[in-house]
A protein has these predicted regions:
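Charged, flexible boundary elements
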Residues: 1, 157-158
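Gly/Thr-rich phosphate-binding beta-strand-loop-beta motif of the actin/hexokinase/Hsp70
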Residues: 2-31
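Phosphate-binding loop and its immediate beta->loop->alpha context
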Residues: 27-157
Length: 158
């Protein structure tokens, strides 16, 4: 059940290996459980060929290690600031822009956080490293802009 009170912003730490979502409620700082009772979600997507669907986090790793046919994609954050972000990759037999791949994962973080918190998050604070790309201010700014664009595309207003 969704809360009737106004939504507050969440904070997303989109990490290379793991991601977390936090929520500041009045007087309470909370890291939100994203997978079972765990506050981290491995930054992994597995596209299961048999079931023609993406799975995320520990389940993605499990299905991959169990030998399901598909494609495992890790370290998604490393796409930010790279030239690959402007290209497509093959997923379940079709071309998918890498930017859309990032959107799938970040949308999953948003969806899981909202389900656990019982409310929608319309605003987000996106964590970022000091530099997405060392010694290249333009690529670093492009990485930040891409992350912001992805957040807006999946429904964050600010």
């Amino acid at each position: 059940m969704k809360s009737a009170s106004p939504a507050r912003a969440c904070g997303i730490d989109f990490g290379t290996s793991n991601s977390t979502v936090g929520w500041l409620r009045p007087g309470v700082e909370t890291l939100i459980a994203l997978e079972d009772d765990k506050i981290t979600l491995p930054s992994v997507v597995f596209f299961n060929m048999e079931e023609r669907r993406p799975v995320y986090g520990r389940l993605a790793l499990h299905e991959y290690l169990e030998g399901y046919e598909g494609r495992l994609m890790r370290s998604l954050k490393s796409l930010l600031g790279s030239k690959l972000i402007k290209h497509d990759t093959s997923v379940l037999g079709t071309a998918m822009p890498f930017k859309d791949l990032l959107g799938l994962f970040i949308a999953q973080l948003k969806k899981r956080a909202e389900a656990t918190a019982g409310r929608e998050f319309e605003e987000v604070v996106l964590g970022r490293p000091v530099y997405f790309v060392d010694d290249d201010p333009l690529a670093d700014q492009e990485a930040e802009n891409t992350l912001t664009d992805v957040a807006r595309a999946i429904g964050f207003k600010e």
